[in-house]
Regions:
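Conserved Rossmann-fold NAD(P)-dependent oxidoreductase catalytic core, especially the SDR/UDP-sugar
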Residues: 91-136
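Catalytic helix-loop patch of NAD(P)-dependent Rossmann-fold dehydrogenases
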Residues: 84, 88, 120-161, 189-190
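N-terminal Rossmann NAD(P)H-binding glycine-rich loop of SDR-like oxidoreductase domains
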Residues: 6-26
Length: 325
């Protein structure tokens, strides 16, 4: 198979559609599959349908597996649905990829899989790939289980598998009432770029690099989040006075925030570290807190063109509240 051919699962979702659009603009042959119809979806059906998946997998060189039930689905779907989609669906894709001779498999996971390990009691938790997961809900538990299954399939078959634990990149409002009531949405997202958010365009870049580097890497798991300005020496003060830490790194930040009526969070409980992804994949995320402040100073939208193009999709056909991932 000399020509690249991608199968993108979850192609009607936020990341999946962004991947399909990006690949098609680059002239790459790509097929989108999703349980819901959408402009980037060629095959409508479940990834747990092994016959459908085997047919869709034929001739593919790479799989970008973004399809999942997310945290917002916890209140609307039984646990069995999470097992069917996140575990059985992933296994179906992995085994079909092995049978089809796929060259690389990229699995979109989540930093939520770290679960209870994310919150540091006396100082901000420093979250790298070495931190052990302690799942706290069915979403995190099934994503972690699917990661482990992917590792087993890699060990048994040699299928190159790269797991990307992505931080927040959704455009929807935060699901925490206190956060929504106290801060403007753009204020929230700007703050999060310091420690727990990544732009959609950078997530797309990470997936495409993972697909490219997968065959030489074989197996790996990476944290995908904007590059933090912080160091481990900041961890204690981030828990008690993050505003002082941020102002030390960015002296212009207090003035830029004051001009908009914005404020920093009273505490930062974790920091995601992306160093391994940058080193191994050659990933160079472009959207970080430095860029956010530069955009604020220039009175420009700090989102990437791709993020603005995709907008918000939500997680339910009939929303009943605020949903995040």
């Amino acid at each position: 198979m000399s020509e690249r051919r991608f199968l993108v699962t979850g192609s009607s979702g936020h990341l999946g559609e962004a991947l399909v659009r990006t690949l098609r603009r680059d002239g790459v042959d790509v097929v989108g599959i999703d349980i819901a119809a959408g402009p980037a979806t060629d095959i409508v059906g479940s990834i747990a349908d092994r016959g459908l998946v085997a047919e869709a997998m034929s001739g593919m060189t790479s799989v970008l597996h973004t399809a999942t039930l997310h945290k917002p689905h916890i209140g609307s779907h039984p646990r069995t649905d999470f097992v069917e989609t996140n575990i059985e669906g992933t296994l179906s894709l992995l085994e079909a990829a092995v049978a089809a001779g796929v060259c690389s498999f990229v699995y979109t996971s989540t930093t939520s899989a770290f679960g209870h390990a994310l919150v540091g009691a006396r100082e901000a938790a420093w979250i790298t790939e070495a931190v052990a997961s302690v799942p706290k809900n069915i979403y995190g538990a099934t994503k972690t289980a699917a990661e482990d299954i992917a590792h087993v399939v890699h060990q048994d078959s040699g299928l190159p598998v790269i797991v990307l634990r992505t931080s927040r990149f959704f455009p929807e409002q935060d699901d925490n009432d206190r956060v929504r009531n106290r801060y403007r949405d753009d204020n929230v997202k700007a703050n999060e770029y310091l420690y727990r958010r990544v732009d959609l365009a950078d997530v797309v870049d990470a997936h495409l690099l993972a697909a490219e580097r997968g065959p030489e890497i074989g197996w790996a798991k990476y944290v995908i989040s904007a590059t933090t300005p912080f160091s481990p020496d900041d961890a204690a003060q981030l828990r008690t006075d993050p505003g002082a830490v941020v102002a030390r790194y960015f002296p212009e930040q207090p003035g830029l925030y004051a001009a908009r009526g914005w404020s920093m969070f009273p505490t930062i409980d974790r920091v995601y570290i992306n160093a391994r992804a940058r080193d191994d994949l050659g990933w160079q995320p472009r959207y970080d807190y430095r860029r956010i402040l530069d955009c604020l100073a220039a009175e420009q939208d700090f989102r990437s063109p791709l993020a603005r193009e995709m907008g918000a999709k939500g997680y339910h056909d009939e929303p009943t509240g605020v949903y995040t991932t």
